[in-house]
């Protein structure tokens, strides 16, 4: 089985829209989203290698030094699957973008490290 990194993507505009939602409605949606995410984890537990976590602020390090930067990555999960397509299918209708204000999930294969 191959390993794949799933990056949860969420734009600032989607989050801003979420925050304008009626507080009671948002709380209900958050509760339902957490429950749906838990069901997704249970349904895919054999494929999940690392549940991952939310991601915080970003620092960029380059030849010019260290600086603050922004991106739309909000979290990650590592899964295993027979193919890239099958890994992507695990995230169809995922609560990240079906219930929560996430935009998408990007899936990339974790390739073996080349010999040094």
Predicted regions mapped to residue ranges:
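Conserved, structured core segments of small domains
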Residues: 1-116
């Amino acid at each position: 089985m191959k390993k794949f990194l799933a990056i949860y993507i969420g734009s600032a505009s989607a989050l801003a829209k979420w925050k304008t939602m009626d507080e009671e409605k948002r709380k209900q949606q958050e509760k339902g989203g957490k429950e749906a995410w838990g069901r997704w984890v249970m349904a895919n537990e054999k494929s999940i290698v690392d549940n991952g976590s939310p991601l915080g602020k970003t620092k960029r390090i380059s030849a010019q030094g260290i600086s603050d930067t922004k991106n739309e990555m909000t979290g990650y999960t590592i899964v295993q699957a027979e193919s890239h397509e099958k890994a992507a299918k695990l995230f169809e209708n995922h609560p990240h973008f079906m219930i929560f204000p996430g935009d998408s999930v990007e899936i990339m294969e974790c390739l073996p490290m080349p010999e040094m």
